[in-house]
Curated annotation (Swiss-Prot):
InterPro entries: DUF3528, HD, HD_metazoa, Homeobox_CS, Homeodomain-like_sf. It comes from Takifugu rubripes (Japanese pufferfish). Residues 212-271 bind DNA. The gene is hoxa11b. GO terms for molecular function: DNA-binding transcription factor activity, RNA polymerase II-specific; RNA polymerase II cis-regulatory region sequence-specific DNA binding. Residues 174-197 have a biased composition (Polar residues). This is Homeobox protein Hox-A11b. Keywords: Developmental protein, DNA-binding, Homeobox, Nucleus, Transcription, Transcription regulation. It is found in: Nucleus. Residues 110-121 have a biased composition (Gly residues). Residues 93-134, 155-217 are annotated as: Disordered. Sequence-specific transcription factor which is part of a developmental regulatory system that provides cells with specific positional identities on the anterior-posterior axis. The keyword Transcription applies.
Length: 284
C-alpha cells in the first residue's frame, strides 16, 4: 500500500495490525449498545443449562431506587415481579397502585406485633390478599413461611408458661407480707430484750399463739437509773424492796422482778467477756 493513499474517516487503525481495515467491513454488525443476547450469541466453556436463571444486570441494577422507570429505563420485570409493590397490587386485584406500599408494610407489621402474645404480622386483621400472596411476614415470599411458623410456634408455646409464672409471682407477692409479719412477730417473741418481753413470750406460748402479742413497754431513763442504782447495791432484791420500787417507779411487781433477772444475765455475760479478755492478755 502506498503512503500517498489517503485514509477515509470511516477507516479504523488497529495498533496491533500492520494494515488498515475499512469501516465498510463492519457494516453488517449492529452497534454494541443496541446488541442483546439474541443478536450477539456467545459461547461458554461450561454448560449454560446447568446454571440457574439469573436476571440481567440492568434489571437488578436499576430497580426502583428512586428512578422513574416509565420514561427512562425500559427493563423487564418478568423475573422480579415479586419485588415490586405495584405488581403485587395489580395481581391481587387492588383498585389502584399506591406509592405508600412501604408504609402499609410497616403499619401492618407494627399492628400485628403489638397484638396478643401469639399474634404475628400475618394475622386476620390485615388485608388478606396482599399478605396471603406475599407471605406471612408481609415482605418475604411464601417460601419463607416455614421459618416463621417455627418461630411463632415457639413463642405461642412459651406464652402459657409465662402467664402461669406471672400468676405464681402475684400469689407469692400477696402471701409474702403476711409471712414476713408472722416471722417478725415470732422473732420478737423470742428476743429477750426486756422483762415484759419474757412475760408476754410465756403467755403466748401458753395460749398457743392465738392471742396477739402485746406491745413492748420500754423503760424511761429515770426508771432505768433507779433500777441500776438498786442493782448496784444488791444483785438480788427481796419482795419488800421490789414492791417499794414498783410503787416509786410506777411499774408492776412483775416488771421489776423480770428486769432484775435480765440484768443478772447481762452482768454474767459481761463478767465472762472480761475474764476471756484478761486471760488472753495476761500482761494487762
Amino acid at each position: 500500500m502506498d503512503f500517498d493513499e489517503r485514509i477515509t474517516a470511516s477507516n479504523m487503525y488497529l495498533p496491533s495490525c500492520t494494515y488498515y481495515v475499512s469501516g465498510a467491513d463492519f457494516s453488517g454488525l449492529p452497534h454494541y449498545l443496541t446488541q442483546n443476547q439474541s443478536t450477539c450469541p456467545m459461547t461458554y466453556p461450561y454448560q449454560s443449562t446447568a446454571l440457574p436463571q439469573v436476571p440481567s444486570v440492568r434489571d437488578v441494577a436499576f430497580r426502583d431506587y428512586g428512578i422513574d422507570t416509565s420514561n427512562k429505563w425500559h427493563h423487564s420485570r418478568g423475573s422480579l415481579s415479586h419485588c415490586y409493590t405495584e405488581d403485587i397490587v395489580h395481581r391481587d386485584g387492588w383498585t389502584s397502585p399506591t406509592p405508600r406500599g412501604g408504609e402499609i408494610l410497616v403499619k401492618g407489621s407494627s399492628s400485628g406485633g403489638g397484638g396478643g402474645g401469639g399474634g404475628h404480622p400475618g394475622s386476620s386483621n390485615h388485608t388478606p390478599g396482599f399478605y396471603g400472596s406475599v407471605g406471612r411476614n408481609g415482605v418475604l415470599p411464601q417460601a419463607f413461611d416455614q421459618f416463621f411458623d417455627t418461630a411463632y410456634g415457639s413463642s405461642e408455646g412459651s406464652a402459657t408458661p409465662t402467664a402461669h409464672a406471672a400468676d405464681a409471682d402475684r400469689q407469692a407477692a400477696k402471701t409474702s407480707p403476711a409471712s414476713a409479719q408472722a416471722g417478725s412477730d415470732s422473732a420478737e417473741s423470742f428476743s429477750p430484750k426486756s422483762s415484759s418481753g419474757h412475760s408476754e413470750e410465756k403467755q403466748s406460748r401458753g395460749s398457743g399463739g392465738q392471742r396477739a402479742r402485746k406491745k413492748r413497754c420500754p423503760y424511761t431513763k429515770y426508771q432505768i437509773r433507779e433500777l441500776e442504782r438498786e442493782f448496784f447495791f444488791s444483785v438480788y432484791i427481796n419482795k419488800e424492796k421490789r414492791l417499794q420500787l414498783s410503787r416509786m417507779l410506777n411499774l408492776t411487781d412483775r416488771q421489776v422482778k423480770i428486769w432484775f433477772q435480765n440484768r443478772r444475765m447481762k452482768e454474767k455475760k459481761l463478767n465472762r467477756d472480761r475474764l476471756q479478755y484478761f486471760t488472753a492478755n495476761p500482761l494487762l
